[in-house]
From Swiss-Prot:
GO terms for molecular function: glucosamine-6-phosphate deaminase activity; identical protein binding. It comes from Alkaliphilus metalliredigens (strain QYMF). One of its GO terms (biological process) is N-acetylglucosamine catabolic process. It comes from the Bacteria. This is Glucosamine-6-phosphate deaminase. CDD domains: GlcN6P_deaminase. The lineage of its organism: Bacteria, Bacillati, Bacillota, Clostridia, Peptostreptococcales. GO terms for cellular component: cytoplasm. InterPro entries: Glc/Gal-6P_isomerase, Glucosamine6P_isomerase, Glucosamine6P_isomerase_CS, NagB/RpiA_transferase-like. Catalyzes the reversible isomerization-deamination of glucosamine 6-phosphate (GlcN6P) to form fructose 6-phosphate (Fru6P) and ammonium ion. Gene3D superfamilies: 3.40.50.1360.
Length: 242
């Protein structure tokens, strides 16, 4: 695992954007696994700026999003579909048919999950997976659990995750209690992974995931076994690393 400690959030975001841009330049038909939440917003802004300067071209890129709230339609402003449109897709030339986000309104959850895995397979697998990390060490919506070798699935969100995500909603009661998420097994099949973290609230999770020990209660710790992982964090998130 490579660890890059940047001065602040802006530099962390630009470092991550450069890695994503390099992947696209090296392989214009790259399959990108994308994350949501507050952490990657700066990276997406930097990628849009690169696109506007004609430094990168998304026309042949395929995107695979990590997750979506279950029970939210894509036109709900808090859906991750809306998030991706507002933060990236509306501003670049990615083809709509190459955008893949789980359907939060799927009636048949099992079929949706199996179908999503099939979309990833047809795309050729994920070349570069972008991840954030929750305060409890979750990646995607893979919460602390005794089961890490799982693929796309419906997950019950932990109380801690619901509390963390309530800042995006009017009140905690509006936060969905379930989500569709790519599983750890699928994430680990990506050719390359970058994980971003910013702020002191993530410092404990970063320490736990880099401790050298695998811990099912810290899902991100499994990334230590992947051959090509880059951890890109700011100084606040790195403050507990020995």
């Amino acid at each position: 695992m490579r660890i890059y400690i940047e001065e602040d959030y802006e530099k962390m975001s630009k470092k991550a954007a450069l890695i994503v841009a390099s992947q696209i330049i090296l392989n214009p038909q790259s399959v990108l696994g994308l994350a949501t939440g507050s952490t990657p917003v700066g990276m997406y802004q930097a990628l849009v700026e690169m696109y506007e300067k004609d430094d990168i071209d998304f026309s042949e890129v395929t995107t695979i999003n990590l997750d979506e709230y279950y029970g939210l339609s894509k036109d709900n402003p808090q859906s991750y579909y809306s998030y991706m449109m507002e933060n990236l897709f509306n501003y670049i030339n990615v083809a709509k048919e190459r955008i893949h986000i789980p359907n939060g309104m799927a009636r048949n959850v099992v079929q949706e999950c199996l179908g999503y895995e099939e979309q990833i397979r047809i795309a050729g697998g994920i070349d570069l997976q972008v991840l954030g990390i929750g305060a409890n060490g979750h990646i995607g919506f893979n919460e602390p659990s005794n089961k890490l070798n799982i693929r796309t699935h419906l997950v019950d969100l932990s109380l801690e995750t619901i509390e963390d995500n309530s800042r995006f909603f009017e009140n905690k009661a509006e936060v969905p209690r379930q989500a569709l998420s790519i599983g750890i097994a699928t994430i680990m099949k990506a050719n390359q992974i970058i994980l971003l973290a910013s702020g002191a609230s993530k410092a404990e999770a970063i320490r736990e995931m880099t401790s050298g020990h695998l811990n099912t209660q810290v899902p991100a710790s499994v990334l230590q076994t992947h051959p090509n992982v880059s951890l890109i964090i700011d100084k606040d998130a790195a403050r507990l690393i020995e």
